[in-house]
């Protein structure tokens, strides 16, 4: 009798994806972040579901319902802070996952890569709408500022913003629809993740060398299942240290003040994981230009397969490209820092220089260095 694992219509899909999957023998810990993102998504959906059981999406009661969750619901504080800090862990894993893809040339699987970029957009949209739900000061003003950016779109801008708001300002209708979208999007993300994996399993995983690994494959289980479990334990450890020791470390104290349309906080800023994009947005004095730069700062990831000029896939054997990659990482850290600073000298000019450098490295410097490295191969 054949093993049910290999014959059952449903179980065999799981088998081909997680058990008998041939995987390269040399993939490093940088390949753990895919599974960690899956765990983050599961944690977020589960904690979010339990929060939704007690949350009310009404401007009058939203803030107090979150307070009620933290004070009166059994372990409500734990669920709430796991959800809030789970989002931070999600983005840490996302950035590392994307960085791994850039460093090792994984973007040459362009269907997998492009679905990944769409996933990044979807997760960012979900996180933004989730931040609005507690209806604190930063929730309200963050929603006002970011949705207002759409008014920069010529001709239809103002109408579009009022349509999204469901009125003439961010109000009850906005909060209700943001809750609805925040609830549904993670399930759309889950479906996209399955498509992401489907395309990945068409080609198999990349590996640190960037070379074809067909001649040296090992089964996913037990080798990478145990490796993933170690990664998951470390992720949960870091998350729980954050949740139990300093749950508000990454939050904004302004969000503990109920939303008040009549008083603007001195510094409106998003959560830390959007600060790099926010800095790029602010570095351009023109509204439409800023919005375009904001969108392009993420959309530019889709250009990497086209901009790949090197004869080698991975950066493992390309020291000049490696150096430029780490300068890009440092530039993103700089942008993140600038995004959280007030709009004044010297932060404005630092932000503008960092924004120019960001686009220059990706569009000009990395491809040019790749071509130079191709020449070096002939020496």
From Swiss-Prot:
Cofactor(s) required for function per UniProt: heme b
Subunit structure: The cytochrome bc1 complex contains 11 subunits: 3 respiratory subunits (MT-CYB, CYC1 and UQCRFS1), 2 core proteins (UQCRC1 and UQCRC2) and 6 low-molecular weight proteins (UQCRH/QCR6, UQCRB/QCR7, UQCRQ/QCR8, UQCR10/QCR9, UQCR11/QCR10 and a cleavage product of UQCRFS1). This cytochrome bc1 complex then forms a dimer.
Name this polypeptide is given: Cytochrome b
GO-annotated cellular components: mitochondrial inner membrane; respiratory chain complex III
Gene behind this protein: MT-CYB
Family in the record: Belongs to the cytochrome b family.
Record-linked SUPFAM superfamilies: a domain/subunit of cytochrome bc1 complex (Ubiquinol-cytochrome c reductase), Transmembrane di-heme cytochromes
Keyword hit for Heme: yes
Domain of life the protein comes from: Eukaryota
Topology relative to the membrane: Multi-pass membrane protein
UniProt-annotated location(s): Mitochondrion inner membrane
Free-text cofactor note: Binds 2 heme b groups non-covalently.
